Amino acid sequence: MNLKYLLLFFCLVQVLHYCYSHGDPSLSNELDRGLIPKCKLVPEQISFVLSTRENQNGVFLTLDNLSKGGILPKSDLSSIPVIFLIHGFISSANNSNYVDMTKALLEKNDCMVISIDWRDGACTHEFKILKFIGYPNAVKNTRAVGKYIADFTKLLMQKYKVSLANIRLIGHSLGAQIAGFAGKEYQKFKLGKYPEIIGLDPAGPLFKSNDCSERICETDAHYVQIIHTSNNLGTERTLGTVDFYVNNGYNQPGCYLSFLGEACSHTRAVKYFTECIRHECCLIGVPQSKNPQPVSKCTRKECVCIGLNAKTYPKTGSFYVPVESKAPYCNNKGKKI
């Protein structure tokens, strides 16, 4: 990400947040009419890319072709784990970080990975710097994408017998906020809750001061796992059942201490989680305190490992996670808990 664009992005988000939230409607209207990209979200253009061990290149799904049947490998998917993967701002499902995570998930388990591509609503196709100042409109699109995922989930369960117990949502940045909204929308069907939502450094700008109904929240699923890696593009606020603050939640090792480094830290959440899947690297979370205990003294009773098995640990709350600067990032000398 270009440094000058990132600097401008931070400045513009602050200005736009003031205009939209603090009552300067004339300026907001002018911005809406001209400067800010619309980043228009058309539900029909949201695609779901299905990857399996047999077809890792992906099959494009929509609510329309899914409802017609015959598009998925078989009609009874009750025993198959399903993982929704949701990208963030100015990104897409074919971003290399999500492709790497998809491969790691498929190597780990025989599952279906469904990557949600909402690139138009995420401002991905807008012109250069304009895509950055479209952020407020991308934020506005997140709830609609979340509802679409909830509708898609319901159809999967009704038509293909997918078990709710086998569904997990993983989202990065705005994608994490979308996962939270999907959890809220699905609960409106009165069919239960998603078992787990994993938020990888949930987007902070325009969400930090929101209450639970307007951001990812621990009530959105039975278990909500949050990985914090940046405090500007992300947020320091506790959001989930467990909140992991990697390197205290900011300035990740190996990322430069600059605005460009902030983007690096923000993306590290995805890389950390992928390494936890790929290498079964136990990034150990130690209960947060002024003087956190050494990782070497951790036991399963009071510490938790980031990853797909986090919810099998009894402890909840906030955790400090030390990491190394290079993959696989483990800073535990091979310790397992």
Curated annotation (Swiss-Prot):
Its EC number is 3.1.1.32. SUPFAM superfamilies: alpha/beta-Hydrolases (SSF53474). GO terms for cellular component: extracellular space. It catalyses: a 1,2-diacyl-sn-glycero-3-phosphocholine + H2O = a 2-acyl-sn-glycero-3-phosphocholine + a fatty acid + H(+). GO terms for biological process: lipid catabolic process. Residues 1-21 form the signal peptide. Residues 22-33 form a propeptide. The active site is at S173, D201, H266. Keywords: Allergen, Disulfide bond, Hemostasis impairing toxin, Hydrolase, Lipid degradation, Lipid metabolism, Platelet aggregation activating toxin, Secreted, Signal, Toxin. It is found in: Secreted. Disulfide bonds join C39-C123, C212-C217, C255-C264, C281-C305, C282-C330, C298-C303. Its main location: secreted. Expressed by the venom gland. GO terms for molecular function: phospholipase A1 activity; toxin activity. It comes from the Eukaryota. Catalyzes the hydrolysis of phosphatidylcholine with phospholipase A1 activity. May act as an allergen and induce hemolytic activity. In vivo, induces dose-dependent platelet aggregation (nanomolar concentration) and induces thrombosis. Belongs to the AB hydrolase superfamily. Lipase family. This is Probable phospholipase A1 magnifin. It comes from Vespa magnifica (Hornet).
